[in-house]
Swiss-Prot record:
Its main location: membrane. Residues 134-139 are annotated as: N-acetyl-neuraminyl-alpha(2,3)-lactose binding motif. Coiled coil: none annotated. GO terms for cellular component: cell outer membrane. It comes from Helicobacter pylori. It is a lipid-anchor. This is Neuraminyllactose-binding hemagglutinin. A lipid is attached at C28 (S-diacylglycerol cysteine). Keywords: Cell outer membrane, Lipoprotein, Membrane, Palmitate, Signal. It is found in: Cell outer membrane. Residues 1-27 form the signal peptide.
Amino acid sequence: MRANNHFKDFAWKKCLLGASVVALLVGCSPHIIETNEVALKLNYHPASEKVQALDEKILLLRPAFQYSDNIAKEYENKFKNQTALKVEQILQNQGYKVISVDSSDKDDFSFAQKKEGYLAVAMNGEIVLRPDPKRTIQKKSEPGLLFSTGLDKMEGVLIPAGFIKVTILEPMSGESLDSFTMDLSELDIQEKFLKTTHSSHSGGLVSTMVKGTDNSNDAIKSALNKIFANIMQEIDKKLTQKNLESYQKDAKELKGKRNR
């Protein structure tokens, strides 16, 4: 009888131990490995050769861009700063002295800046990166004690949307002399991605042996690098000395009216 009771007691403890191990394992979240193989370089070298310097100054306003939620704040800031830096280089390459204005609003020009600036360049727009609905699938993990991975996955292709608008102004009057807009959805940029997130449930036993991969951040950086290069190439084509000097008559008239 004692042996029988001892066996039952051992079996009960073993059962409790097994249940505890199961509960512990089920409560563990699967590990997600986020790749970091792409650098946000935002490189561009002006294509045209340097031209003869002019005794004219161009005011360069800080870019006013909005971004989709999946673009990190640090990427937003770097994109904005690099845009201003490269446009400044493009204008200098075309023979102009550039005055960088720490504002996106033309109303913040000082009187001295309005007076000495031949032209002003303003930039605004929206930079959106979104999954292509036709080529993106989502797979959610089903709850379960054993075979649930506890990972939700979205796999597909990231594409750009939005626009960048560049406006050329006469600083004293604030009047627009010209503008051009780039439609980002027309760019041939397609970045494959796999985004993995933890499910609303913790997953089953198999989740402790599963490692998820998330390369969506690398896809975003790669897309931003390509968007940046395309934008700069177009700006480089438009902001030539020949084009900018064609506004001289209108700019002089507008500035003269305000000075009277």
